[in-house]
């Protein structure tokens, strides 16, 4: 057990090293710092209370798996060096380099991004809960590229089968915006060639999936629930395809600042089609193109997008509510209704119980949903 210090808990470089089964607590800088190396295994470590980064690494061909990283960059814990010197300081896990795999980690209560990566990497089967608690304009999972269009360093990256629940953002110390900006999955400036597939994103103050000045992204089979806007595409540079996603809006955004929207788009030659949209509370102003809000029909007419997509605008029945259920383990889980009456998004009723495979989710509507247990 490595406990407290003014710098790093563990600092390492080299090749074919293993960092496993350590408990690292309350270091002012980084919990684990890998300055360079390849074929390194970082697994099953518990890192808590680091102020700059939980895990901070510059590696290639390495694996980060089964780690629990929590309470990174929490305001009340900050020391004389604050959050660190970089704009991206405060992230739970930061990995830079090619061909790393970041999987099966639990990243809880991060001051800035939950998981941030640079260059070509695979991020899969992670649970990110509560990010951007100290800093704003970040994401549960975040990437960008230092190499400009069209040579994105992120090309070939995959973000799949992750669950992101709770990205709050904060207005403390920043008054330009009226609402906090916590993004679920955030592909930022010049990120390109990233596949975002089969993720679940919920409870974000800003957008579930945010594409900002990026390009050639493939966004498929994701579930987005309870965000300001399910998808935001801002200045896409072209080649992006968005399909087969479930975007589910509640009555108001999580901060109760506006009507929740399904898709917002500002510029960019993209393809959006074959998605499932749900908005039980309002049919107007749930899509946005540049500065104008539209209904689903108006959106399709103005953009030519979503020709084969569906949008459920039916009102909930008396006493009905909606809820998201997910499985963050690597085993199948059975959920029991215990008297609840529940229906899936496709209208199929649930009887008795339902199963969820690892890192999958389901949205149910009905009565008595709080009775459901596993």
Question: Residue ranges of each PLM-predicted region?
Answer:
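Extracellular beta-strand/beta-solenoid scaffold signature
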Residues: 4-10, 26-34, 49-56, 78-94, ...
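Short, solvent-exposed coil/turn segments
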Residues: 40, 86-88, 100, 136, ...
């Amino acid at each position: 057990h490595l406990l407290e210090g003014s710098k790093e808990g563990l600092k390492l470089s080299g090749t074919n090293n293993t960092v496993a089964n350590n408990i690292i607590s309350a270091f002012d800088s980084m919990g684990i710092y890998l300055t360079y190396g390849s074929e390194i295994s970082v697994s099953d470590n518990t890192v808590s209370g680091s102020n700059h980064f939980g895990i901070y690494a510059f590696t290639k061909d390495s694996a980060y798996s089964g780690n629990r990283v929590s309470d990174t960059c929490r305001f009340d814990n900050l020391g004389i060096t604050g959050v660190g010197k970089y704009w991206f300081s405060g992230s739970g896990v930061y990995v830079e380099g090619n061909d790393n795999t970041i999987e099966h980690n639990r990243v809880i209560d991060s001051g800035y991004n939950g998981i941030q990566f640079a260059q070509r990497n695979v991020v899969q089967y992670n649970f990110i809960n509560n990010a951007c608690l100290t800093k704003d304009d970040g994401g549960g999972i975040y990437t960008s590229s230092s190499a400009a269009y069209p040579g994105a360093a992120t090309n070939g990256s995959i973000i799949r089968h992750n669950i992101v629940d709770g990205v709050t953002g904060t207005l403390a110390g920043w008054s330009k915006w009226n609402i906090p900006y916590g993004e679920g999955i955030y592909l930022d400036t010049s990120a390109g060639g990233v596949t975002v597939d089969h993720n679940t994103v919920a409870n974000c103050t800003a957008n579930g999936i945010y594409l900002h000045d990026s390009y050639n992204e493939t966004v498929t089979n994701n579930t987005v629930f309870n965000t300001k806007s399910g998808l935001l595409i801002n200045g896409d540079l072209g080649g992006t395809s968005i399909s087969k996603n479930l975007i589910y809006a509640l009555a108001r955004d999580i901060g109760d600042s506006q009507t929740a929207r399904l898709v917002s788009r500002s510029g960019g030659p993209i393809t959006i089609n074959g998605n499932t949209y749900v908005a039980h509370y309002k049919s107007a102003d749930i899509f946005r193109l540049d500065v104008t809000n539209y209904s689903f029909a108006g959106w399709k007419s103005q953009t030519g997008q979503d020709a084969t997509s569906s949008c459920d605008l039916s009102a909930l029945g008396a006493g009905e509510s909606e809820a998201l259920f997910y499985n963050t383990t690597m085993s199948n889980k059975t959920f029991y209704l215990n008297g609840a009456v529940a229906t899936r998004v496709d209208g199929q009723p649930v009887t008795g119980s339902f199963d969820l495979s690892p890192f999958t989710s389901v949205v149910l509507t009905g009565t008595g949903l709080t009775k459901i247990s596993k």
